[in-house]
């Protein structure tokens, strides 16, 4: 073999094995940021729904870079984040084998959209969930609930709230809300319990958890591609054109001995629908979707909403709070995203840069998108035949 390379690193990482379908549809937070008792009490994560992507223009503020003080065009993702409702509190004890939950305290009133989470078939069920538990709040002025909260204060080191999304406020057809544990960081354990208990049955908006220019992580399940071949799945080299019996294959899958195929060999199989954590996404904007100027900037003062003309394709309109993050995030549109505070303190100039947007694209996602607002389109096209028919 002439001109053979002396080294050929393997194709594809073995760090993410097994490449199989995720066990859960919702992105799970496997670790929360380190707690610091000196900081004020705060929540560390939230959930939202991926609406789509758009384009922004801004001036780069990065001294030393070639593009410093020049316009840059960047892709951003819009995540629909209706306020989450806190419905419970969980206390954890540290043991030699990790965290163990001591007890869970639930709120008195739970909406149907979160109760659906506890049923396989809501339509046929008797809907009796939490009917016995609710009596604890009324018996002896909630003495049992108070006792459990005191136990958490006495024995626990980690406190998390149970919060669910308000999925009915989104354009999605699904009625079952997503429920997750959100760790409370900062302050003493007693402060954490009081903070969490004070949030019971109350909405928690996204701007009370994250802020503009913060760097966050997005946890989600990636887009599924089904059963794919080895070339698409692992990125192995295609064989020469004249190869017998196919060329999108691995030519040698191992030696004679050991007489089995090793686990490190690239094979065909499931691609996508994997649980992934995408780190270091900078928040460019947190806004209200129903505000008339949610996509306006200091340079482009046009009154326009963040929803593009005709809505986000395969999602719809955003009428709640939203988060605009830099770049793309895992998963398809409509998929639930878990947003988590970063695991460490960022010190780089890139992470600490203050972002000022100059323009946000709100043109239609269908076609070439020539117009930013319906008014601009009408002004350009003038009076149409359909307008005359409607007026007559």
Swiss-Prot record:
Gene Ontology terms, MF aspect: RNA binding; structural constituent of ribosome
Gene3D superfamilies cross-referenced by the UniProt entry: 3.30.1430.10, Ribosomal protein L3, domain 3, Translation factors
Pfam families, sorted: Ribosomal_L3
Record's keyword terms, sorted: Cytoplasm, Ribonucleoprotein, Ribosomal protein
GO cellular component annotations of the record: cytosolic large ribosomal subunit
Transmembrane segments: none
Entry's localization field: Cytoplasm
Span of the signal peptide: none
UniProt-listed InterPro entries: L3_arc_euk (IPR045077), Ribosomal_L3_dom_3_arc_sf (IPR044892), Ribosomal_uL3 (IPR000597), Ribosomal_uL3_CS (IPR019926), Transl_B-barrel_sf (IPR009000)
Family: Belongs to the universal ribosomal protein uL3 family.
Function, in words: Component of the ribosome, a large ribonucleoprotein complex responsible for the synthesis of proteins in the cell. The small ribosomal subunit (SSU) binds messenger RNAs (mRNAs) and translates the encoded message by selecting cognate aminoacyl-transfer RNA (tRNA) molecules. The large subunit (LSU) contains the ribosomal catalytic site termed the peptidyl transferase center (PTC), which catalyzes the formation of peptide bonds, thereby polymerizing the amino acids delivered by tRNAs into a polypeptide chain.
Complexes and interactors: Component of the large ribosomal subunit (LSU). Mature N.crassa ribosomes consist of a small (40S) and a large (60S) subunit. The 40S small subunit contains 1 molecule of ribosomal RNA (18S rRNA) and at least 32 different proteins. The large 60S subunit contains 3 rRNA molecules (26S, 5.8S and 5S rRNA) and at least 42 different proteins.
UniProt-recorded name of the protein: Large ribosomal subunit protein uL3
Gene giving rise to this polypeptide: rpl-3
């Amino acid at each position: 073999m002439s001109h053979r390379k002396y080294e050929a690193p393997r194709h594809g990482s073995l760090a993410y094995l097994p490449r199989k379908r995720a066990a859960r549809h919702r992105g799970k937070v496997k670790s929360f940021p380190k707690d610091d008792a000196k900081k004020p009490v705060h929540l560390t994560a939230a959930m939202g729904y991926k609406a789509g992507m758009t384009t922004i223009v801004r001036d780069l503020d990065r001294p030393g870079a070639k593009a410093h003080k020049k316009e840059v065009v960047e892709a951003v993702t819009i995540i629909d984040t209706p306020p989450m409702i806190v419905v419970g509190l969980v206390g954890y004890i540290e043991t030699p084998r990790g965290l163990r939950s001591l007890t869970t305290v639930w709120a008195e009133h739970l909406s149907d959209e979160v109760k659906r989470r506890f049923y396989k078939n809501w339509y046929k069920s008797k809907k009796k969930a939490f009917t016995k538990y609710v009596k604890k709040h009324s018996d002896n002025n909630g003495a049992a609930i108070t006792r459990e909260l005191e136990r958490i204060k006495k024995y626990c080191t980690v406190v998390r709230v149970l919060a669910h999304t308000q999925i009915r406020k989104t354009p999605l057809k699904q009625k079952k809300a997503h429920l997750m544990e959100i760790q409370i960081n900062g302050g003493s354990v007693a402060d954490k319990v009081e903070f969490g208990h004070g949030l019971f049955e109350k909405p928690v908006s996204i701007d009370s958890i994250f802020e503009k220019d913060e760097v966050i992580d997005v946890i989600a399940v990636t887009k599924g591609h089904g059963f794919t071949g080895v070339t698409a799945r692992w990125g192995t080299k295609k064989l020469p054109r004249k190869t017998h019996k196919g060329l999108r294959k691995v030519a040698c899958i191992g030696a004679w001995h050991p007489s089995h195929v090793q686990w490190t060999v690239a094979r065909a199989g499931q691609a996508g629908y994997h649980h992934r954590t995408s780190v270091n996404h900078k928040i460019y904007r947190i806004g209200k979707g129903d505000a008339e100027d949610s996509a306006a900037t200091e340079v482009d003062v046009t009154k326009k909403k963040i929803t593009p003309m005709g809505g986000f394709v395969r999602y719809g309109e955003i009428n709640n709070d939203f988060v605009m993050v830099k770049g793309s995030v895992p998963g398809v549109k409509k998929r639930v995203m878990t947003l988590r505070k970063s695991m460490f303190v960022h010190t780089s100039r890139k992470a600490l840069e203050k972002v000022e947007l100059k323009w946000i694209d709100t043109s239609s996602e269908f076609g070439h998108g020539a117009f930013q607002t319906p008014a601009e389109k009408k002004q350009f096209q003038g009076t149409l035949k359909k307008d005359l028919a409607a007026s007559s």
